[in-house]
Amino acid sequence: MRVIAGRYKGRRLNTPAWEGLRPTSDKLRETLFNILAPRIEGARVLDGYAGTGAVGIEAISRGAAHVTFIENNRRAAALIASNLKECGIEGGYTIQCAEVGAALDARAAADAFDLILLDPPYDIGDVYSVLERAAGLLASDGLLVLERATRLEPDVPPMLARVRDVKSGDSTLTMFIKADASEQATHP
């Protein structure tokens, strides 16, 4: 796995030697960032269920101002730190080793993010709750992206408006904006 574009293009990212982590494929990550390109420069990004950190590192490489990585697995959080170090990234990020829902609850609404990227385990029980919590931290013109199994259709909280689905193999990227912003927004 490598950083696809930007300042750290071509840098190798370590992948886990243990089961249970499903890193976003290079192809799907490239598709995602081609869509997000106009939103990345200077953005405040939250990478939830960060795993290897590949998605957040890609955002940093492409000019995000700050990335908050949230990952509850200690080995994965250490892997994120290692990947950041291997890429030579010395700042512009925070790694939080915590359960994503609890970490979202602990953040203040003033802590708004321009992009929230969530890649929960496909068998997670309550995507609705996580989407609801994340929506409270989304900037008024922000975008929330959920990577999910194509076969699993998420229930969507009323404060979010679904604007796009991008399918790739067994995975789908579902994109949301705040429902109150949906009338005046340009969609990704």
How would you label these PLM feature ranges?
Residues M1-P188:
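Class I S-adenosyl-L-methionine-dependent methyltransferase catalytic core
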